[in-house]
């Protein structure tokens, strides 16, 4: 999970660095073509001005990503639960069946020992 977060941080820093670099205007002879090329840049600048500080937006985005990662089911247990729910005749229900010795939940009085 830490590697995923680190990867997101690196990607966000690279994207912010690329957006912060000034763009060298191409030599366009047609004014209509030049306006068409500048329109996305103007929109991006307007969004950046209205959103506020880029670091605050990055922090909010990372916080939202971390919340989604924590809520998402992961690992082997989620796969096992899905497999058990598919077969209703499965004998093991909630990891408890006859003959299973769970030392943490049962006391010695529950069992009859031959003497």
Swiss-Prot record:
GO terms for biological process: axonogenesis; cholecystokinin signaling pathway; digestion; eating behavior; neuron migration. It comes from Mus musculus. Transmembrane segments: none annotated. It holds the Pfam family Gastrin. Binds to CCK-A receptors in the pancreas and CCK-B receptors in the brain. Keywords: Amidation, Cleavage on pair of basic residues, Hormone, Secreted, Signal, Sulfation. This peptide hormone induces gall bladder contraction and the release of pancreatic enzymes in the gut. Its function in the brain is not clear. Binding to CCK-A receptors stimulates amylase release from the pancreas, binding to CCK-B receptors stimulates gastric acid secretion. This is Cholecystokinin. The precursor is cleaved by proteases to produce a number of active cholecystokinins. PANTHER family: CHOLECYSTOKININ (PTHR10786:SF0). One of its GO terms (molecular function) is peptide hormone receptor binding. The gene is Cck. It comes from the Eukaryota. Belongs to the gastrin/cholecystokinin family.
């Amino acid at each position: 999970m830490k590697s995923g977060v680190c990867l997101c941080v690196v990607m966000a820093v690279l994207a912010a660095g690329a957006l912060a670099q000034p763009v060298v205007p191409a030599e366009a002879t047609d004014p209509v073509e030049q306006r068409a090329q500048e329109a996305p840049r103007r929109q991006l600048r307007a969004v950046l001005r209205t959103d506020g500080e880029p670091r605050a937006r990055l922090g909010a985005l990372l916080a939202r990503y971390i919340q989604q990662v924590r809520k998402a089911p992961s690992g082997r247990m989620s796969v096992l639960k899905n497999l058990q729910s598919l077969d209703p005749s499965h004998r093991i229900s909630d990891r408890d069946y006859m003959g299973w010795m769970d030392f943490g939940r049962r006391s010695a009085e529950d069992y009859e020992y031959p003497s």
